[in-house]
């Protein structure tokens, strides 16, 4: 009986082994930023990984002017890490004239853009972290020059 228990314990441990991690080096994300500045690209996905049936991803964003409209991601929560630059970031409020857009190629899923109405403004600077829950309107209303930031996106598994 003891050998059978040991075998079952071993099989159980093997089935629950952790999934291999996704690694992004400093050199990797700095190379992405350098290329996107040269190519004038705003949102550049770096890597994505399946997690619990959903998707976790990292993207580099580089903006030279504030956004013309605000954005809501229906299912994706984003966490921003400001790397360089300063500006004013607005969260909350609501969208006027909202239009659906599919941002799946950026790992941001079904989203809506529209005119920002209300919300809370905050000054952001290098080192700041902002968590934007799914369904929250957000945008940069002003920039003091170019701004670069990493975005961590998580889209949970969708119920079928």
Indicate residue ranges for each PLM-predicted region.
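A mature extracytoplasmic/lumenal domain signature
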Residues: 62, 76, 83-86, 91-95, ...
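A short hydrophobic beta-strand segment most commonly corresponding to one strand
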Residues: 145-160
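His/acidic/aromatic-lined binding-pocket segments of jelly-roll/cupin-type domains
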Residues: 71, 78-81, 122, 129-130
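Bacterial N-terminal signal peptides
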Residues: 1-12
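Acidic, glycine-rich flexible loop segments
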Residues: 109-130
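A short, N-terminal "cap"/entry segment at the start of jelly-roll beta-barrel domains
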Residues: 11-75, 159-160
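Conserved metal-binding segment of the jelly-roll/cupin
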Residues: 123-143
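Short, conserved beta-strand element in jelly-roll/cupin
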Residues: 74-89, 93, 102-114
């Amino acid at each position: 009986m003891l050998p059978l228990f040991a075998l079952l314990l071993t099989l159980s441990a093997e089935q629950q082994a952790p999934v291999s991690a996704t690694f992004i080096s400093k050199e990797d994300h700095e190379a992405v930023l350098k290329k996107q500045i040269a190519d004038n690209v705003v949102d550049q996905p770096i890597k994505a990984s399946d997690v619990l049936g959903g998707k976790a991803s990292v993207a580099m964003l580089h903006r030279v002017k504030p956004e013309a409209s605000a954005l809501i991601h229906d299912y994706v929560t984003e966490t921003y890490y400001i790397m360089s630059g300063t500006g004013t970031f607005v969260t909350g409020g609501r969208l006027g004239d909202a239009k659906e857009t599919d941002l799946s190629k950026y790992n941001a899923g079904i989203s809506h853009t529209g005119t920002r109405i209300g919300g809370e403004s905050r000054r952001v600077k290098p080192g700041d972290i902002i968590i934007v829950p799914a369904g929250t309107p957000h945008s940069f209303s002003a920039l003091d020059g170019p701004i670069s930031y990493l975005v961590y996106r998580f889209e949970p598994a969708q119920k079928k």
